[in-house]
Amino acid sequence: MAPGEKIKAKIKKNLPVRGPQAPTIKDLMHWYCMNTNTHGCRRIVVSRGRLRRLLWIAFTLTAVALIIWQCALLVFSFYTVSVSIKVHFQKLDFPAVTICNINPYKYSAVSDLLTDLDSETKQALLSLYGVKESRKRREAGSMPSTLEGTPPRFFKLIPLLVFNENEKGKARDFFTGRKRKISGKIIHKASNVMHVHESKKLVGFQLCSNDTSDCATYTFSSGINAIQEWYKLHYMNIMAQVPLEKKINMSYSAEELLVTCFFDGMSCDARNFTLFHHPMYGNCYTFNNKENATILSTSMGGSEYGLQVILYINEDEYNPFLVSSTGAKVLIHQQNEYPFIEDVGMEIETAMSTSIGMHLTESFKLSEPYSQCTEDGSDVPVTNIYNAAYSLQICLYSCFQTKMVEKCGCAQYSQPLPPAANYCNYQQHPNWMYCYYQLYQAFVREELGCQSVCKQSCSFKEWTLTTSLAQWPSEASEKWLLNVLTWDQSQQINKKLNKTDLAKLLIFYKDLNQRSIMESPANSIEMLLSNFGGQLGLWMSCSVVCVIEIIEVFFIDFFSIIARRQWHKAKDWWARRQTPPSTETPSSRQGQDNPALDTDDDLPTFTSAMRLPPAPGSTVPGTPPPRYNTLRLDRAFSSQLTDTQLTNEL
């Protein structure tokens, strides 16, 4: 064998064999871990320290277990041929139903409090339209019809004015007949009465502050609206001074209002209703309220399985100046919700059967940062003065009532009282009407800041209502039906009933299909991680293990090396400072003593294997050895061992 071949065979014999030709399984696994694209296996081999190796072993085994589990689920799901059928019969909670008579108090019970006000109102109607009191009222002897000898107290507090379009800036005082110059703001309010011909006269009233220097005039195209608004202001002032217990007694009891009651085909009575006193509608009664032990539910749809009541309206006890329609008001709401009957209540007619079909819709919105809604109102800086769950309407009215107490010194009569506040009245707060109207105009123009502070509730229920009417009772059944109801209510009603005194109401679910509207984030954490993983895997072939490697190298090892270098520099600086400077010149270092000599701790190559260590006790010469031609081995290993090629001869 040639000398070159012998040296080559000897070097191959001494060098370890790597790769698929490795002699042992340990060497094979070592080669695999060093050359595979699976990141975790390589980190197990190259990591220094027992703790890091254990952590990488745990990470890798966990990833392998998750892969096996997910793949097994996918395989089982693929080969499983089955279907699932779910049959669900649901019951829907029946909502709370609040019923009020449109007339808040019996006229016979409050007539003593309203005698002077009604007399002045009659005079205004007589002067404007020639309207006189009905014969029925006169025969009842309710009150005098003239104001002879009586000072016009209410006209003096809020003067009624008649405006003529031909005379700008002037108005005629309704009581004295004198013309006066109108200064300040003139606010025209729309009328809800239809006019075929446009009227050239406007009726209104003037509100002034205490010093009468600042006034506001409100005009109406219809005198009916002007007088009703004027009457309502005085009415609220009078009723605000009446104790609550007395007002409850002056209104309708549950036994008077409710003639018959059925729910889901079973009889119910006044005990199933809860009293709720409303400032503007008197005694109202709520069916299926939150104060009940259990919330009633229904398992069937249709008119036969809802709430059926017959109401006694008693038109003879209506206040002719406060309300101009006959019937009842109904509101469907949640059990913990305040019934804003004056805003969203439905009116039902007398001598009619009103059927209301419901369809439930639940809405769930996402809170911040997806929307500006609130979960329970705790993050809204407005005190809830209602004994009910938060809603946007409650927040707006609470905000306005709080501003009313701050600006005017008293609370508006139609809303609940804030803590340590009283309702407005002339005696204690003579300026409250002007203050209230000015504040309300600012509220409508969104100048109080309530609309910007209050938020919509994130979750709420609403019922889509379908209303149908039918004449009730029919002519064929009217006689016997009214006789039976009169006999049945003889203890509560001391007169023969007629159909204009009664109203029938049916409230039911059209079907039990419940619609839910739920918001969900378009981009969730899972979606974000999935998108990141897809991009990293597509462009860099990177996985979760690769991310952990990056964290280890660039956030742990990187800063550890920097800190270690700074620490060594500090130690060297401190050592040089402590050691006195030496006068001896350092000897030149050559060979292995030279710091420029690179020592490699990696696996041996042919070049490093040929670099034999010096003999013990020998010194490395400072001059290079002579060039002997017998040591030239480039021809022997020119094709195999390129590392031994020497430089060109000098």
From Swiss-Prot:
This is Epithelial sodium channel subunit gamma. It catalyses: Na(+)(in) = Na(+)(out). It is a multi-pass membrane protein. One of its GO terms (biological process) is cellular response to aldosterone. Residues 135-222 are annotated as: Gating release of inhibition by proteolysis (GRIP). It comes from Rattus norvegicus. Residues 577-628 are annotated as: Disordered. This is one of the three pore-forming subunits of the heterotrimeric epithelial sodium channel (ENaC), a critical regulator of sodium balance and fluid homeostasis. ENaC operates in epithelial tissues, where it mediates the electrodiffusion of sodium ions from extracellular fluid through the apical membrane of cells, with water following osmotically. It plays a key role in maintaining sodium homeostasis through electrogenic sodium reabsorption in the kidneys. Additionally, ENaC is essential for airway surface liquid homeostasis, which is crucial for proper mucus clearance.
